[in-house]
């Protein structure tokens, strides 16, 4: 009951934040690829989800900025795209289409084996990343890494248990304001999934300036807002992603987040 009430409050608050957010002109198409889709499948698939009712190309938001930096820096042959959290089915279809190299509508064991997928998101988008990983599990498709930033689940969702097709998962959260993220994620199978950590971002101690966000966000959801515009946090995530997209990925231990404020 308490969770249901909290979820309803989150919906109302996130809707207000979306209404208060300034509208931007369309950014560069988030579907721009670093490979020729007509010739070969991508070596890497990186998919992000924005939170609330944010547009996938609103460049003032952390996931969109991260995707653009990854596009500009990662190896050729990498597909990078951001989706609205409500477009999970569209993201799923994109992954299946990219993996289905023979275009027969069915993923073969070899096509699944070639999957090199990283998923990340903020708020409702973080929950969407976990749910997409779960969708891919039903197909037998592995996921390298999921990254949750201040993850907020909708009423019918479970963003706390990471499915066993995910190799590594990490969770960042804060506790300030009306909306705050899940404190802890766990692995459905600890043998197959390594939880890199549940990291508290203390914005009372180390505040982040977010001048482009609404007065409502500053007043009522300051921590949630800061988790989305925190350059240090998103740089850590970018480094984690880039390490795993290199030809010879570093070990899980070497790729853990750098000096988090606190670890659970």
Language-model-derived ranges and their functions:
Residues 35-115, 219:
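Active-site catalytic motif of lipid deacylating hydrolases and related acyltransferases
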Residues 55-63, 88, 92, 121-129, ...:
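Solvent-exposed, acidic/flexible segments
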Residues 10-19:
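Bacterial N-terminal signal peptides
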């Amino acid at each position: 009951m308490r969770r249901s009430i909290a979820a309803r409050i989150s919906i109302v608050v996130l809707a207000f934040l979306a209404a208060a957010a300034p509208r931007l002109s369309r950014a560069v198409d988030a579907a721009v690829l670093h490979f020729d889709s007509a010739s070969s499948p991508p070596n890497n698939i990186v998919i992000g989800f924005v939170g609330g009712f944010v547009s996938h190309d609103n460049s003032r938001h952390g996931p969109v900025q991260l995707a653009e930096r990854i596009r500009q820096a990662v190896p050729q042959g990498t597909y990078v795209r951001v989706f609205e959290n409500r477009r999970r089915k569209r993201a799923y279809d994109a992954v299946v289409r990219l993996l289905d190299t023979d275009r027969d509508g069915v993923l073969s064991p070899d096509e699944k084996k070639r999957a090199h997928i990283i998923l990340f998101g903020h708020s409702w988008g973080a929950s969407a990343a976990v749910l997409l990983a779960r969708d891919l599990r039903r197909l037998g498709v592995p996921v390298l890494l999921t990254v949750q930033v201040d993850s907020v689940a909708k009423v019918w969702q479970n963003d706390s248990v990471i499915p066993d097709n995910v190799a590594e998962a990490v969770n960042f959260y804060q506790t300030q304001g009306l909306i705050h993220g899940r404190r802890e994620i766990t692995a459905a199978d600890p043998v197959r999934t390594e939880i890199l950590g549940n990291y508290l971002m203390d914005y009372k101690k180390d505040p982040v300036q977010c001048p482009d966000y609404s007065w409502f966000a500053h007043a009522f959801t300051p921590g949630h807002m800061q988790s989305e515009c925190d350059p240090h946090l998103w740089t850590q995530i970018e480094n984690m992603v880039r390490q795993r997209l290199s030809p010879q990925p570093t070990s899980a231990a070497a790729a853990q987040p750098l000096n988090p404020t606190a670890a659970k």
